[in-house]
């Protein structure tokens, strides 16, 4: 989840990680904790053992990103019929791969893939923000997914406004133009200020409108809260901090409280508007390094969600604020600075004893990519991830980034996952 897409931005974050992690391996290629993990680390997946250890219900998801037309629609300006056809093709491929959940990005940049009274139609549909595409993409996606036995999770980006820094390029009626005091330019992009209570209230109204209209199975956030840090740049929220941050010892603590409030309030709003609808978040995979906090993972990541994105993802899991978490574990087994095996174990321990379901985010987009190391040239790498994760009973499934790679599967990595682990259909956990 183009750098502006969440997963490709995460790839940029990984380049920071690689540049700053340096030194000794975070956990080396950590000694396997079980026979199953040992086989996985040695490149010998044991799919039957993996399947046998799984619960009858299992998350098997795929993200379908719309920002910059990453996965769907393939380009802006297609006819409504062509867009529908591409959408249903993605759903049909999910069914063939025995997946059970599609996570569709429906509010990528303070816009909408449904007829919202709050925000304009997304430009990913027509090429022009605010132009009616002539159909209801979210309503259609929910109906067509359910007709195929798939869950449809609506994926929202709360605070990202635009992938450029020019407010005049937004529609004249855009809330960000009507309320310029809500907007913070940063890193060549426009963001809503999470420190303003009126902003937090507005983005929740905009998102909950979709929940009220459609029987989505879940609301989904990704890793974007405060923006990823950029050297030499400052996210200018000093005025908001002066007005609202007096009770906090630092601006960082105030920022974390702002995001905590969004998460708690959104969970309550979802339950109020459509009881039983779940709420999940997919954060960057490292909460904190152990060198920063002894409760953290044995990693040397260049990005830590607690410190850099002001997202206390561990707290949300431990305090059961969300129904599920999907940490983006976009590294291979044995990667020195952020070993998949170490992080899978850390998240499993974090979820232990909570009501928060743990699913692991998988970097299918790296499989066969020329710029990736040799581990990602092996079509068995992702299958090894699932085998290793099966040793942790807290792991209740996986989500793959993203739809384009599920469809194309350039080196057969997804086909190998399906053959090794998805021989039979499974329902998602509830």
What are these regions, as identified by a protein language model?
Residues 278-326, 331, 335-339, 343:
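Substrate-binding cleft/loops of secretory-pathway carbohydrate-active enzymes
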Residues 313, 323-335, 354-429:
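Substrate-binding cleft of secreted/luminal carbohydrate-active enzymes
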Residues 114-126, 160-186, 224-246, 291-301:
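Aromatic- and acidic-residue-enriched segments that line the glycan-binding/catalytic groove
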Residues 65, 69-81, 159-209, 307-308:
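Active-site-adjacent "subsite" loops/lids of carbohydrate-active enzymes
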Residues 153-157, 220, 255-303, 357-361:
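Aromatic-lined carbohydrate-recognition surfaces of secreted/lumenal glycan-active proteins
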Residues 2, 7-30:
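N-terminal export signals
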């Amino acid at each position: 989840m183009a750098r502006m897409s969440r997963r490709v931005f995460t790839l940029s974050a990984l380049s920071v990680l690689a540049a700053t992690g340096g030194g000794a391996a975070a956990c080396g290629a950590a000694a396997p904790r079980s026979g199953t993990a040992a086989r996985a680390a040695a490149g010998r997946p044991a799919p039957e053992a993996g399947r046998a250890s799984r619960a009858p219900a299992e998350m098997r998801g795929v993200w379908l990103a719309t920002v910059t037309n990453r996965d769907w629609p393939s380009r802006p300006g297609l006819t409504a019929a062509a867009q529908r056809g591409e959408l249903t093709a993605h759903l049909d491929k999910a069914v063939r791969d025995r997946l059970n959940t599609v996570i569709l990005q429906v509010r990528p940049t303070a816009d909408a893939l449904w007829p919202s009274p709050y925000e304009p139609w997304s430009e990913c549909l027509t090429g022009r923000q605010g132009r009616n595409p002539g159909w209801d993409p979210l309503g259609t996606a929910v109906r067509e997914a359910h007709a195929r036995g798939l869950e449809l999770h609506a994926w929202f980006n709360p605070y990202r406004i635009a992938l450029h820094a020019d407010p005049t390029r937004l529609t004249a009626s855009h809330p960000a133009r009507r309320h310029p005091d809500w907007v913070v330019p940063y890193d060549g992009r426009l963001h809503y200020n999470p420190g303003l209570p009126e902003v937090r209230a507005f983005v929740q109204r905009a998102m909950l409108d979709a929940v009220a209209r459609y029987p989505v199975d879940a609301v989904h956030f990704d890793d974007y809260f405060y923006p990823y840090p950029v050297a030499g740049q400052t996210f200018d929220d000093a005025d908001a901090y002066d007005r609202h941050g007096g009770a906090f010892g630092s601006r960082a603590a105030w920022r974390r409280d702002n995001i905590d409030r969004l998460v708690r309030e959104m969970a309550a709003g979802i339950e109020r508007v459509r009881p039983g609808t779940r709420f999940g978040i997919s954060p960057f995979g490292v909460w904190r390094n152990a060198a920063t906090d002894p409760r953290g993972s044995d990693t040397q990541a260049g990005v830590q969600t607690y410190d850099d994105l002001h997202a206390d993802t561990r707290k949300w899991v431990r305090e059961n604020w969300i129904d599920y978490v999907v940490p983006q574990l976009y590294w291979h087994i044995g990667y020195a600075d952020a070993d998949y095996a170490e992080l899978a174990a850390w998240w499993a321990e974090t979820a232990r004893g909570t009501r928060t379901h743990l699913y692991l985010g998988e970097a299918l987009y790296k499989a066969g990519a020329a710029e990736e190391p040799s581990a990602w040239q092996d079509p068995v790498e992702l299958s090894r991830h699932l085998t290793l994760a099966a040793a942790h009973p807290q792991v209740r499934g996986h989500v793959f980034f993203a739809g384009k790679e599920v469809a194309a599967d350039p080196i057969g990595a997804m086909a190998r996952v399906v053959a090794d682990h998805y021989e039979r259909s499974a329902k998602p956990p509830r």
